[in-house]
Amino acid sequence: MKFTKLSLAALIAMGIASNASALENVKVDGQVKLWYQTTDMTSLSTEAASATSKNDGIFKQVGAIGDLVAKLRATGDLTKKAGFGTTIYTATTLGLENNLVSSEAITVGATNETNGITNGDSNLPMWLGEAYMTYKAGKTIVKIGRQELDTPLAFTETWNAAPNTFEAAVVVNQDLPSTTLVGAYVSRGNGAQNTTVAKSFSAYGNVGGAYTPGETGAGAYAAGVVTTLIPMTTAQAWYYDVIDVANAFWLQADVKLPYGLGLGLQYAGANATGDVQNKTLAGVKDKDTDAFAVKLSGSVVGVNLAASYSTVSSGVIPVGNTATGFTKTKLYTATILSDGRIAAQPDVDSWKIEASTKLAGFNLGASYGSYDVKENKDGLRAFDVYGLNKSKNPSEIDLSVGTKVDDINLTAYYIMQNDYAAKTVGTTVESKDRQAFRVVASINF
């Protein structure tokens, strides 16, 4: 259900305006989402007797995380040319950490570090995920403020209980036929590695020695063009300057072929610059990372099929999301857990097959990804959270089923990841295999 009117008190509370009469076409919507995941790791320690270092069994508290997140969004027009948008999030564990989960699904503490609901910030955390103004002149739209972004190397991730967002100025122009031009400056973001989102917003870029984009720095610039001028093809080209982190580019073409076939091509590169290069790369020869990916897709008797391959050269910077410590990537070969943390890492070759269909009211999906991790001899895996090395050849199976029961959207995932992490040097700890079960339930209003 969507509302077209909003009370003055609510408008003031959401920081939209102090005079409701100036607003037109106000729409309010929202969502309540319950996010839960349990993980079972095998061979976490080579010492079988070390019970404290094992999570032996799925659905146990030690390997489970979860959150309940509510979202309230309002958009509207201030004038015929100016508009606004704002989104509030609030999160709680519902006390699940007492017996069902060990931590929350997202970071919602005072910073985008490891603080959160279960370790000190338990007063129903709230944050303003979006607060922006828009202005339209002809075929040009300017959007300034806190907002979601969707570009290949800086984007909002929606897989978790709440998305990360940015403080940015974006200009979009469509004067050219069948072509969209985009220019953006990103000053801050609340993305964080693995946990994706934090309450506070930190400066974008300048990872220094911490290897965590988003904590300090001078921001990032991006420019892109998306066009459908080439028949049956959507082509896009992007350039990024993440100050003191990297210069990067992304080229992609998705082609609709005869007989319902599709062909996708991706080529991207990232060159370490500034603090990353000067402070952390002494003696490193391969400072540039290049990636190439190809995907072939089609449909047979109502089943969507696809096969993809990617190769990432040796280097330093992963070809992934600069907003979340490269947690996710838009490379075709990414799977749920083997994403920016494996598929996009330097000196990794990947392939993936996938299938999806609709059956009796259910959305079914399955995929298998295989990853050949090589030495990266002349590069540096500065952004590697798994401890990848040439002795590891991870693989992953993802199964999903989604449906709607009354007003509740339900999606369940089963994830099996094998041989994904290296033995910790000087210890007996070795995270070899793991399986995970994730459930997401939501109600939109």
Spell out what each predicted region is:
Residues 34, 142-156, 181-187, 223, ...:
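Transmembrane beta-strand segments that form the barrel wall of outer-membrane beta-barrel proteins
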Residues 172-173, 178-255:
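Internal metal/ion-chelating core segments
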Residues 96-118, 188, 199-203, 314-316, ...:
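Outer-membrane pore/translocation modules
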Residues 156, 160-163, 189, 215-217, ...:
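Solvent-exposed loop/turn segments connecting transmembrane beta-strands
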Residues 196-200, 208, 219-227, 235-238, ...:
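Outer membrane beta-barrel transmembrane domains
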Residues 41-54, 58, 97-103, 153-161, ...:
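Outer-membrane beta-barrel translocator domains and adjoining extracellular loop/strand segments
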Residues 228-232, 252-378:
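Detector for outer-membrane/organellar transmembrane beta-barrel domains
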Residues 2-149, 169-179, 227-228, 254-257, ...:
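Beta-barrel outer-membrane channel/assembly domains of diderm bacteria
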